[in-house]
Amino acid sequence: ARDRAAVFYLGDETLKGFLHIGTSSIAVLPNEIKSFSWSPDGKSLAYLALKDNLINLVIADASGKNPKTTFRTPITDARISWVSSEKIAFQTAPSGLAEGFIFAFARSSNAFSKVYGPGFGLQSLWSPNGTQILLSQAARENGGIKTGIYDTAKKQYAALDVSTLTDKCVWGGTKEIVCAVPRDIPALTVLPDDWLRGEFDSGDRIVRIDAEKNQSED
């Protein structure tokens, strides 16, 4: 939504949030929202809120009004991405020391299903059309990172010849990805943990990836 933004901040040790709408209007969001995502068309929003030891998926209009709980899950560390009008993706918290998963919630059927996983250090970045996922995972055999593209329709994974985190990438349409790629990953680095803690200075180079041909160039 171009005319509005969701703002979150820590106040009195409580995570608070609000919507800044247009030039002057503000709508307060519930406290302690765990994750937030706009719908692809910007007309709705979704967020996760903890209640009775379950994570509630709540959908509201773009002003935060008319909230409705549509799904509950015990995956309390999940983060969401509204990847298509029909599908909201759930990603477990990434750690190179734990297996991660990606799930999808189908709005029309209320079905909740696994999309990908397990994978240590699993991170994801969905394509704008919600059909492909850029994935990064811990390469436990050498302590680095392996990066690839997963086609959700064909259920096929294609490895890329770059090693980077999805946090360092952005889709440019549905066919191109631009990434900052670490020049070196020291031994014993735990990713993405060290990166998320600000303890990994990667010294990146910029790489452009053709998502159709799975080829990259500086």
Please report, for each region that a protein language model flagged, where it lies by residue.
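Short, conserved, GDST-rich strand-edge loop motifs in beta-rich repeat architectures
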Residues: A180-D201
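Conserved beta-propeller blade repeats
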Residues: A1-R4, I26-L48, P67-Q91, A111-S136, ...
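Solvent-exposed coil/turn segments that connect beta secondary-structure elements
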Residues: L10-D12, L50-K51, A62-S63, S108, ...
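Post-signal peptide N-terminal segment of secreted/secretory-pathway proteins
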Residues: A1-S24
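Surface-exposed loop and turn segments in beta-propeller and other repeat-based domains
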Residues: K213-D218
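Short, flexible helix-coil linker/hinge segments at the edges of structured domains or between repeats
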Residues: F18-S25, K51-D77, F90-L97, F103-S108
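Short, solvent-exposed loop/turn segments at conserved positions within beta-propeller repeat blades
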Residues: L10-L15, L50-I55, A93-E99, A139-I145, ...
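Beta-propeller blade signature
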Residues: L19-G22, A60-A62, F103-S108, T147-A153, ...
